[in-house]
Amino acid sequence: MQFSPFIPILLTLRTALRHLPLFALAGVLCLPVLALLGAWLPGVDSNAPLPVLKAMAQTVLPGYLWTTLWLAIGVGVGAALLGTAAAVAVTLFDFPGRRSFEWLLLLPLAMPAYVTAYAYTDFLQFSGPLQTWARAAFGLEGRLLPEVRSLGGAVLVFVVSLYPYVYLLARAALAERIAHLMEAARMLGAPLARRIAAVALPLARPAVAAGVALALMETLADFGVTSYFGIQTFSTAIIKAWLAMDDGRVAAQLSTMLLALVLLLLWLERRSQSRLRFSARGAGGAAVSLPRALTGWPAVLAGTVCAVPVFLGFVAPVAFMLRPLAADWSVL
């Protein structure tokens, strides 16, 4: 009995020791972030980076910021629409090829975004095979397609490359956590369109937001596509400060600004979700909402919704890169 006051302390110590490896792993993972934050600490040359940052803030930094924001908005909206539409199609409907599309829609993840950018640019640019053939075949002159290496082109490349993040998480949410609620809505007489709009999509919002967050973080951290397309974003500014200006401290400070922007976006989305109590947790029951069989034009539409992302994100880039082999196998 005389040791009873120490029992809670011993139990707490035991719990802390049991989680010590997790704490150590978390500390190791935080080291890169702490290193970036250390760039703001005063040092021997503490005044050196300030004029550089002030000069960038007065000249190029606002343009970098706006371009980055527009890129993030375009990629976020596009990936959400493309990924959610594909997830709804393969989860709630049954049409020819549905089983194949369930895994085909993941193939763009195997294609790096910068490789997709190279493939589209080579095929669609002014001197590319498509415009060259069109000018020769129809007697046309000048540029026939918008410039691929632009902000809009970058948005397209990122959307078709990163939408699987949204698709994968949204499909899991629709298949595992919302089936019983969709079945309940059906038994109450709600039509299919209302069940999708009022039940499936709102409940899948946390999963869609998580997928969009993953796509945005990869977009903001990308340098290959933005550099190749000549788009001035925060990532290109960081690389320029590090390599062209040979100033690692300014690059680290710019990196913390980009990290703060990402955290702000995540916080805003988390706050908006906290005000809405719609997230379903767990399966909640054994009811299963079977996919609705589609025939005719509805089946064609559902198949098109799934086929277009696969074609743009994987089939077309691979075909563009394999095109030289069809003309000359000696390149192997």
Language-model segments: residues:
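Peri-membrane helix termini and adjoining interfacial loops of integral membrane proteins
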Residues: 40-52, 126-139, 229-235, 276-285
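A short amphipathic helical element positioned immediately N-terminal to and/or at the very start
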Residues: 48-57, 331-332
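Short coil/turn motifs that cap or connect alpha-helices
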Residues: 96, 190-191
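Flexible interhelical linker loops that connect adjacent transmembrane helices
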Residues: 272-305
